[in-house]
């Protein structure tokens, strides 16, 4: 795998540090809250599968992918408005279940009420190619250089949420090594897409507060310690 995708990035702009550490995790309809509170950093959830649809055609690696114009333009408007107010934006990219696009969920995973979000699918060829194309689309659209999004800029990217708990990244019971290996493949794909577009964007994963102390039900193979994830 590539270790330095940033060298080919067309956007080599320096990372812009937020003016203050005061921030807010927002919904798309919370523009006024952010302005009223005077925050200079916001986190926005991006529902991965909702981006597929119609209205925007995107060519990637010899294939055409179709994106939901109304969803994309809603994100364009909100993110560009924040940037216009000198507010830095972090995207938390989450893989929600979509019956129309089962290829986005890790192969072999069944829909369950115990999961909020699912593991990204880089296991099958179709899943990998579609997932990679969506990552590339997001990286390009929110590079700060795309006039189609009114130059909307995402500076920080987080793949999934609290990855040591499968409620946010469900793939079914798995030992720690298998789980981390699966997430790692998705993360490398994500990292490459972002950094090969904007060299100095920052790409993260997140953990919850269970660092070393085990969950009560740690042996169920869907919960792991944060330390275990990092060490693996």
Over which residues does each language-model region extend?
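N-terminal substrate-binding region of glycoside hydrolase catalytic domains
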Residues: 1-152, 156-158, 163-175
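Noncatalytic carbohydrate-binding groove/subsite architecture in carbohydrate-active enzymes
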Residues: 17, 131-134, 139-140, 146, ...
